Amino acid sequence: MKKVRFIFLALLFFLASPEGAMASDGTWQGKQYLKEDGSQAANEWVFDTHYQSWFYIKADANYAENEWLKQGDDYFYLKSGGYMAKSEWVEDKGAFYYLDQDGKMKRNAWVGTSYVGATGAKVIEDWVYDSQYDAWFYIKADGQHAEKEWLQIKGKDYYFKSGGYLLTSQWINQAYVNASGAKVQQGWLFDKQYQSWFYIKENGNYADKEWIFENGHYYYLKSGGYMAANEWIWDKESWFYLKFDGKIAEKEWVYDSHSQAWYYFKSGGYMAANEWIWDKESWFYLKFDGKMAEKEWVYDSHSQAWYYFKSGGYMTANEWIWDKESWFYLKSDGKIAEKEWVYDSHSQAWYYFKSGGYMTANEWIWDKESWFYLKSDGKMAEKEWVYDSHSQAWYYFKSGGYMAKNETVDGYQLGSDGKWLGGKATNKNAAYYQVVPVTANVYDSDGEKLSYISQGSVVWLDKDRKSDDKRLAITISGLSGYMKTEDLQALDASKDFIPYYESDGHRFYHYVAQNASIPVASHLSDMEVGKKYYSADGLHFDGFKLENPFLFKDLTEATNYSAEELDKVFSLLNINNSLLENKGATFKEAEEHYHINALYLLAHSALESNWGRSKIAKDKNNFFGITAYDTTPYLSAKTFDDVDKGILGATKWIKENYIDRGRTFLGNKASGMNVEYASDPYWGEKIASVMMKINEKLGGKD
């Protein structure tokens, strides 16, 4: 090909392009053209009707040939023989150019599936952005745009749709192309349209129905490539759980809100089932369906034993469980106690558990070639008398719980069957009796229950009323009534301790037990210092009547002490490590809300919980002995969530069960709260004593 020459003409003619030229009937003379008027053509276009083509006659009067002509912003190409190129490709210096039907070189335009750039040259192996279509295209080596195919360009794969458009931010089968159009090769991808994560593998396809290990965690990609999250997957003969972030649950607990149960997933993510898990310093059991055992019994076939799992799934050990209307005991290894003896260090007593683990109560047990008796609270009778209503006889159980027989105990003869040969354990000449059972009822003359009193309490024989072999007329803590003879044991006032009162010249004390006394009032002038006084009601004495300032105080009246003053009590009385310390505001809140005296509430809680330091207080936030029954105080005591709820919840309970029912003062066994709240006949007196002590320390405002 001839070297291309660009002709830059400063045209002086009106005619600037072939479109404006006219056909001529002139003649050719070699490379020159004579027009119809005989003049020679120069610097102008000529259209030859014979050749049906345009020619350009240069200034030297020869036609342009194998060269470019620029007119204005347009380029034309004159081929060999001078013919103007049109509607065709022209190759020049290894590049291809396209001349349109008017002979103009096309630029920045599509020619079929090819594209010519700004210079007019056909684009080869390069990207083209078409703003008209707002899309990218790629021109291959053959000059045609890629279409319906993948191309690898500079190490990256791209897909071009029908029409050559570059696919971006879309799926193509199992592959995904990002915003730049490049195929994602490996890694995580979040698709907003599907609101899911996908994982692209090394081959460029998404993971489908398979596990992926990434950054130390396993993930599962479901059918369609969707990442499993907050859901269960059954695989490898086991259940697995994928958490909210898609990670497999492993060596951890998961709560499933649908089944409302906890599950544990072992190493590798396998769901634990029919097996034990040690965690949080406790054993847990995962049942056959994987659910954590909770508030239920589980039989383990391997150890052939029953276990109980508490709230939270913790295995019960060294604890009591109330279930099926019976107490059960779980030993240190969690196994249910069954057909065996158990010593409870807290109650310092032995218990026997029958087949099935049921606690024995009010029953005889034959063991070690001897009879043993389990009382109503399940405790083994030891070093004590027991009345058996079935055989209507008294028995004595020695140290170790062995039933005594063919021997004399405390002067009483026992037969070969263990029965006391002397009949009833009463002495009609005795003035005082002691309560034998854990609790015993006091009845009116018609047999209706009046109150109940605790084991060891001393009652007075009321000689003004008639007693018989079945019941004795008694009086205690202001209450007169009758008690079953089988519940009482005669005392010898010359040898046995009988509760009494005594003044030291400053305080008047009630000695309720050997070396145990409580101040109940200030010294009165009518009192003789050092003299023992006896009273059946704690109010009337020989020569004077006692006025206890708080025993009959109306507890619906507010105290005169503030929360801050109540808080000072602990330092004034040198009381440390108390859960009730700095809870004056809570006691005052209870007073305001439930209209119960805050000083009384503090004193009551102090008595029942040893100033907030008892085991029941620490373990259960129970400071008022709520449902702490005499037979099972710790086990039956109600549990509160925290200290404040323990105070407020108990106050509400006291209001509903006592204050609202007219028992608005502490009282004794004849009237007031003491009638039913506690079996201790001096419970009210003891709380009143604490109130008196606090009142004195705080200045006597009440």
Swiss-Prot record:
InterPro entries given in the database record: Cell_wall/Cho-bd_repeat (IPR018337), Glycosyl_Hydrolase_73 (IPR051056), LytB_SH3 (IPR041074), LytB_WW-like (IPR040742), MGlyc_endo_b_GlcNAc-like_dom (IPR002901)
Enzymatic reactions: an N(4)-(oligosaccharide-(1->3)-[oligosaccharide-(1->6)]-beta-D-Man-(1->4)-beta-D-GlcNAc-(1->4)-alpha-D-GlcNAc)-L-asparaginyl-[protein] + H2O = an oligosaccharide-(1->3)-[oligosaccharide-(1->6)]-beta-D-Man-(1->4)-D-GlcNAc + N(4)-(N-acetyl-beta-D-glucosaminyl)-L-asparaginyl-[protein]
Gene Ontology annotations of biological process type: cell wall organization
Protein keywords: Cell wall biogenesis/degradation, Hydrolase, Repeat, Secreted, Signal
A single GO cellular-component term on record: extracellular region
General function of this protein: Plays an important role in cell wall degradation and cell separation.
Annotated GO MF terms: amidase activity; mannosyl-glycoprotein endo-beta-N-acetylglucosaminidase activity
Subcellular localization: Secreted
Cell wall-binding repeat extents: 42-63, 65-84, 86-105, 124-145, 147-166, 185-206, 208-227, 229-248, 250-271, 273-292, 294-315, 317-336, 338-359, 361-380, 382-403
PANTHER family per record: PEPTIDOGLYCAN HYDROLASE FLGJ (PTHR33308:SF9)
Entry similarity comment: Belongs to the glycosyl hydrolase 73 family.
Signal peptide: 1-23
The protein's name in its UniProt record: Putative endo-beta-N-acetylglucosaminidase
Protein EC: 3.2.1.96
